[in-house]
Amino acid sequence: MDRAADHGVDALIAADPGVLGYASQRHPQLTLHLSVQGSATNASALAFYAQHYNIRRAVLPRVLSLAQVRQVAANSTVPIEVFAFGSLCIMAEGRCHLSSYITGESPNLCGVCSPAKAVRWSEDAEGLSARLSEVLIDRYSADEPAGYPTLCKGRFLVGGKRFHALEEPTSLDTLDLLPELAAMGVEAVKIEGRQRSPAYVEQVTQVWRAALDAHRLAPERFAVKDQWRQVLAGLSEGSQTTLGAYHRSWQ
């Protein structure tokens, strides 16, 4: 953090109160963003972080609906950032213990749910197997799209039936929600790039840059292009996308 400040970075993102406290006291000139791992889901929580650590932006967890995001944005003095595309987490972010149960490493400390060193792929007559710390997470036939092995998206035998007990491999894609997110005052959108290749990041950011520019120039005429959908679909986990928690029919 000290080196980052010396190099003049634009902002630092953090969740640990100790880190935030050190940064705000030692480097008050630094712009601090609250990470999604802070798991702040309401205006009161954001006000706490702003008062004690002077955060300038907060990334909301992916478990909130559009109605909840709208409520937070309307009642918070802290600018809001939301996830727009990438891996989907169904857990209360910053509080998941599934990965550490299997790998022995905390996502909060090590930065990933499934460390690359714990992932192993193998192919045999039964298909393609994905393991995490030698625990079989899923097995795919030749015509099935394979997802990255995370425990919450594994396929397991439950009650004699093999299925995705928690969540299927899928990616969050909110291109269709861009006008609504802009209208409710969302300051920025976040593209999940952890454990992704430069090629993945390049293609996703190109699509989103084009979409954001198109919306800014003519918001009333904004429409998602088929070409954008095709690119993002090809980069999605399991070759499928979802609106995740943003879409809840009862809200």
Locate the predicted segments by residue.
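A cross-taxonomic marker for long C-terminal extensions/tails that follow the last structured domain
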Residues: 52-55, 82
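Short, glycine/polar-rich helix-capping loops at beta-to-alpha or helix-loop-helix junctions
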Residues: 42-46
